[in-house]
């Protein structure tokens, strides 16, 4: 769940957008999630490691909506990428001791759903409960997505047995527009993302 939202955030990174290597290019104002879901960045959450009042370039951080009710609102930028995009920096520069500033996200939360993970499994009926992801192959220009995975086989809404050495594939744009969140997000970590039910993924494995 966190990795899927992480791939989305990578596509909203101003450096990738400025290079033209984002599958969300030209998508500001477009529908990218179900209409009841938002992604909010809050750099002021107490006792969370990614909280900070200023970014690495000395600009004040702010609470902002990256996605508002399914609509993409904003890129994530530092001074360099914002100049290239003719925008104002969102105050998201980060850097290491010997590296140049790059855009990065602070604390992120995705709107919680109304059902538990168990209820979503019953809604799914038959499918896979993914618990671990391995490697990745993502086309940054198209959003085509393929990753190794392991987890549990689910039948009639009930977990049956563990499975591994699977490959799951799809297109991130389609996957994200169909997600249904559970209500189990952990509130004490930097990325508050619940379990996600996703339809239409291709699964391969023996």
List where the protein language model places each region:
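Active-site pocket-lining segments that scaffold enzyme catalytic pockets across diverse folds
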Residues: 1-24
